[in-house]
Amino acid sequence: MAKKVRELELPAIVDETDGTVIYEGFPDDVSGITTATERWAIRKQAKVGNVWTTSWANGNQKKINAWDDRATLTYSIIPLFSNYQG
């Protein structure tokens, strides 16, 4: 089963592309994996105007992506509380 990002977990790697997009990588385990290994959860923060949005690769926090693929993955905003009923 793929692990998910833990609350208050800090990213192991950060890529600030151009001042409007920041990628943060959360590895399954920092020992023995590379940036090409599909064991990363990737968070994307994007700024449009004065508003920042936070989204996750494949719309979840599971550690199933390769950090090297961060620019080509599909990102979705996920609810802060997964059991939120609205």
Regions found by a protein language model. Name each.
Residues 1-86:
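Intrinsically disordered, compositionally biased low-complexity regions
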